Amino acid sequence: MTAALELTGVFQHVGQRCALAGIDLRVPEGAWLLLVGRNGAGKSLLTRLILGLDTPSAGGVRILGQDLQSLDSRALATLRRRLGVVLQGGSLLEDRSVIENLVLPLRGRLGGRPQMARAARLVIASLRLDGLENLLPRSLSLGQRRQVELARALIHRPDLLVWDGLSDGLDPAAIFDTLAVLRAQRVNRPLTLIATDNRADALGDGCDQVGVLERGRLIFHGPPKALDAALPQRLDLRYVLTGRP
């Protein structure tokens, strides 16, 4: 099966510290991977490498069949048009309304303003964000902001969605709605999802693979049902990731 993501021997140094050490990872097209670990384990740093925002100190990163290190700025920009991205810290334009933020990825792709506005309203409705279209981001709660960021990441139907901090700011009902939208997107096309969180159950039963990062090392990568057996002596880590002793 074609790989949506391949990491080979990836190292990343931050100053004198080795923040990521020898990461090997392969995610098939259409699979859902949840990267989990405690704060500081390297999840966000790895996300930035996957997106080409940082360059690894050593090793290779391939996204949707393309070697990131071999791409010039124009080719990288073209590749990123196939990605949907939700990062921690937020990326909404504070002086633009919700609907203006949502249509940004559609410029040059989907007709004129009426078509773009219709697409934005459809994704707003799917996430139950009706009534927020004309508000500025500063008027939104943290959970609403995160969902608007997700809506913007999905509006152009990306091949790969990268979501750093899956449950950040979202209550259980919002997480349920969000996962329902992602499952619907997955029905007719191979949407690949790479998400990060502190908990291994964040994706529910939609998760195909779990990767566990601990101090910059990938100590487990496999199906969720194999996680407990893979960490028999790490009761502290297992409790943090699953809530089970």
Where are these regions (language model features)?
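Conserved catalytic motifs of ABC-family nucleotide-binding domains
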Residues: 157
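Conserved ABC ATPase "signature" region
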Residues: 115-132
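Helix-to-loop junction immediately C-terminal to a conserved catalytic motif
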Residues: 51
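Conserved ABC ATPase signature
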Residues: 136-140
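Catalytic Walker B motif of ABC-type/P-loop ATPase nucleotide-binding domains
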Residues: 161-165
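ABC ATPase NBD coupling module
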Residues: 68-84, 230
